[in-house]
Amino acid sequence: MKITKNILKAEFIKRPNRFQAYVKINEKIEMVHVPNTGRCKEILIPGSTVILREENNENRKTRYDLIAGYKGDMLISIDSQIPNKVVYEALMNFKIEILKEYTNIKREKTFGKSRFDFKLEKENGEVYYLEVKGVTLENDGLTMFPDAPTERGTKHILELIDVKNKGMGAGVLFLIQLNGVKKFTPNHKMDKNFGEALRLAKEKGVDILAYDCLVEESSISLNNPVSIEI
């Protein structure tokens, strides 16, 4: 997907809280919004190059969103709104192999008391619920989720097991917001409960998927499946 708004580079200075950061643009210090509540501490390093998206919204306190950062030569998208958009585009273009037969794609749908990112249906009425998780944590080709404890994420995984137990399809797709990685694994050290929930989900028949992305400064799209170690 193309990012149609104005894109520019800046130098990262600091991040005083989850939602705000300070960057340097043409020698001027500017406060920007960070659309990711994760820690991203391996990416947002003082002096590193980051990518900003200009919002031009008079009702905002900040003019820019900090949407990506360079880790060496590797560009990593950190915008938490991007994964669902990328996966939606991929579903509409039948790029996810095991989900190609699902032609009716609905976003943000509930099942019982649970809300999932996607509800998919085949022409024969078969239903599949899909949850998407964005991944930004990478170390020497190994990617992990989460980068901070996530009770909400664990709850989603357990809810997918419930969907599967009721006879419907269920899956979680980890969208790795960078390119050229080797493997994905749950971050057991950061959140043991999430890792255990994911292992149980796999045992119960929930599909566990991981894809990396082609990331450029003004675009991002689904790329290739990534091997998973649970």
Swiss-Prot record:
A molecular function (GO) term: DNA binding
- Return the CDD domains for the record: SfsA-like_bacterial
InterPro entries under this entry? SfsA, SfsA_C, SfsA_N
Q: Which family, according to the similarity comment?
A: Belongs to the SfsA family.
Q: What is this protein called?
A: Sugar fermentation stimulation protein homolog
Whose protein is this, by species?
Answer: Clostridium botulinum (strain Kyoto / Type A2)
